Amino acid sequence: MSGVQGASVGIDLGTTYSCVGVWQNDRVEIIANDQGNRTTPSYVAFTDSERLIGDAAKNQVAMNPANTVFDAKRLIGRKFNDPATQADIKHWPFKVTPGAGDKPQITVEFKGETKTFQPEEISSMVLIKMKEVAEAFIGTAVNNAVITVPAYFNDSQRQATKDAGAIAGLNVLRIINEPTRAAIAYGLDKKGGERNVLIFDLGGGTFDVSLLTIEEGIFEVKATAGDTHLGGEDFDNRLVDHFTAEFKRKHRKDMTQNQRALRRLRTACERAKRTLSSSAQAYIEIDSLFDGIDFNSTITRARFEDMCGDYFRKTMEPVEKVLRDSKLSKSQVHEVVLVGGSTRIPKVQQLLSDFFNGKEPCKSINPDEAVAFGATVQAAILSGNDSSEKLQDLLLLDVTPLSLGLETAGGVMTTLIQRNTTVPTKKSQTFSTYADNQPGVLIQVFEGERSMTRDNNLLGKFSLDGIPPMPRGVPQIDVTFDIDANGILNVSAVEKSTGKENKITITNDKGRLTKDDIERMVQEAEKYKSEDEANNVRIEAKNGLENYAYNLRNTLNDEKLQGKIDESDKKVIDDKVTDIINWLDHNQSAEKEEFEAKQKELEGIANPIMQKMYAAAGGAPGGMPGGMPDMGGAGAPPPASHAQGPKIEEVD
C-alpha cells in the first residue's frame, strides 16, 4: 500500500442512515452490522448507564427522546441562527443551544450528568460505530476512510465532516461528493461510448443532482446543484404536523409538547411513508398515544403527495440548473439514476420521468448502498489497492459546487473560481490598491453566486501589510486560489515589488473546531469507548450470574432428579437463588466485581451439594433436560469409582 497503514473503508455518513463498505476479492463488499442490517441508523442515545449507537439507539428512542440524538448532519458546519437550524429545532426532541461563535451544541443527560456535545462529536460516534462494523467483518483494525458529503456542502460543512473523522480516530483519505460516488456504482462495469448520466440523489436530509459524462472508466462531473436541507425527514415532518392537527381536531387535546408521543407518532409516520411507496393507502394505529387515547387514522398516497407537493416540485429546480450549467438539453441525457431512499417515492419518480419526456429512471443500483459503494472504490484506489484491473483505468474528475472569490471596492464579489470547475484547481488574478499610499490590503474570501459579497458566505480573511507607499493602482498583488482534492480552499497573496506574502487555508475558524478541540474530543471518544467496553464486561458478569442462578433452579426442579437430592439441601440452594435474584433486581447497576463475588458465593453453596447429588446418582444418567449449571470452574468431576456413567464435561 502506498504509505497507508491498516485497512481502508468507504463510509456514507448519512443524515438518517450510514453505510460502510470494503474492497475485497476484487469487488465491493457492503458490510452488515451486528443486527444483520446493511445500513445503520445515524442515531446516538445517552442513558443513565450507557451510550448506544445505531439500531440500539433508534430502538429506544420513544422511551428516551430527549437524550437520543439524530440528524447531526443537518447541524454540522452550520450556525445556530441559520434559518434551517431554527426550523429543525422545532421538530427535534433533544435540546440544541448556541455555543461559542454561534455554533450549535447538543445538550443531553448522560449517567446523571448534563453533557454538551458538538455536532462533529455526534457524527464521530456514528463513524466509530461504522468503523467497528467494518473491523468485525475484516478482522483487522480499520485506520483509513473515504467519507462522503453532499455535493452541495459548503467549505465549513466539509471541514466539520473531516474533523468528525479525526475525532473517530480515522485517517480521512478524502472527503468526496455523494452523487459522484453513486455514479461509480452505476458505471464501474459499463463499457462503451460516452454517456451523459444525471444522478438524482434524494436522501433522508439532503438533496443533490449531478450531471456526469462517463466514458471508458473516466467519470467527469459537468455540473452539480442541490439543497443541503431537503429530504425524507421533511416529508416525515409534514405527516407529523398533519396527524397532530388531526388528533387535536378529534380529541381537543394538544400533544405537541409531549416528546414521547411525538416520537411514537414520527416512527409511525415514517413507516406509513414507506408503505405509501408500494400501496395506495397506509394505516396508523398507536395505542395510548397521548392521555391514554388510542389513535387510529389513514393516509392515502394522493393526500401525501398533495401535502409534500411543494417539496417534490422543488426537486426539479436543481435538475434544470445542472442542465443549464452543463449546456445540455434533456434529450442529451442518456440515463437518469436514482440514489437515496426518498427516490422510492412514486411521485418523485413520476415528476422526473415527465421532466425527461417519459424516460424511465434507472433503478438498477441499490439507492441505499450506491454512495458507500463508490466511496469504497475510492478508498481502494487511494490506499494503493490498484492492482485490480477494474480500478486501474478509473479516473474521477469532480467539481466545486459554489463559486469562490474575494471582495473588491464597493463590496463587489470578484469571482476567481467559477462553480462547477473541476478540482483540484488553481487560479490567480492580479489586484491593486484602492487609495494612494495604502500600506496594506484586507483580503476577504467568499463563496456564493450573488454579485455582492454581503449576499454570499464569508469563508475567511487575512491582511497583506508592508506595501511600500505608491499611488493607487500601482502595487501589483497576485492572489491565488488553490482547491485541493478534498474541495478545501487555500488562498495566498503576494505583493510583487517586495515579494511580501501571506496565505490562509480556509479552515473557517468561525465554524470550525480548533486543533485543541479535536485533540480533546479524540481523548473523550477514547474514554467513552473504554467506558462502553467496561459496561459490556459488567453486563456480561450480570448475565452470567443471572443465567447461573436460573439454571441452578431449573436443575433442582428437574423431574429426573426428584428423590436424588435432600429436601434440606434443595431448600438451602433455592433460598440462596431467591436471595441472589432479589439482589439482582435491586442492583442492576452493580460493578462487575460485585456480580462475580455473588456468583462465587452461590457456587460455594451449590457446588458441594450438586457434586454430592451427582455422585449419589452415579454420574448423570440420561443427560439432564435442564442442563448442568455452569459451575464457574469450582466443580470437580465425580470420583473415578463412578466412571461407569457417561462423562460430563464442565460447561464453560
Curated annotation (Swiss-Prot):
A GO MF term: ATP binding
Gly residues bias spans: 619-635
Keywords: ATP-binding, Chaperone, Nucleotide-binding
Top-rank taxon, per record: Eukaryota
Cited SUPFAM superfamilies: Actin-like ATPase domain (SSF53067), Heat shock protein 70kD (HSP70), C-terminal subdomain (SSF100934), Heat shock protein 70kD (HSP70), peptide-binding domain (SSF100920)
Induction field: Constitutively expressed, but whose rate of synthesis is augmented by nutritional stress such as nutrient starvation or excess of organic nitrogen.
The keyword 4Fe-4S appears for this protein: no
Cited PROSITE patterns: HSP70_1 (PS00297), HSP70_2 (PS00329), HSP70_3 (PS01036)
Pfam family, one: HSP70
Xref: CDD domains: ASKHA_NBD_HSP70_HSPA1 (cd10233)
InterPro entries (UniProt xref): ATPase_NBD, Heat_shock_70_CS, HSP70_C_sf, HSP70_peptide-bd_sf, Hsp_70_fam
Entry-linked Gene3D superfamilies: 1.20.1270.10, 3.30.30.30, 3.30.420.40, Actin, Chain A, domain 4 (3.90.640.10), Substrate Binding Domain Of DNAk, Chain A, domain 1 (2.60.34.10)
Disordered: region residues: 618-652
Family (UniProt): Belongs to the heat shock protein 70 family.
Protein's UniProt name: Heat shock 70 kDa protein
Natural source organism: Achlya klebsiana
Gene that specifies this protein: HSP70
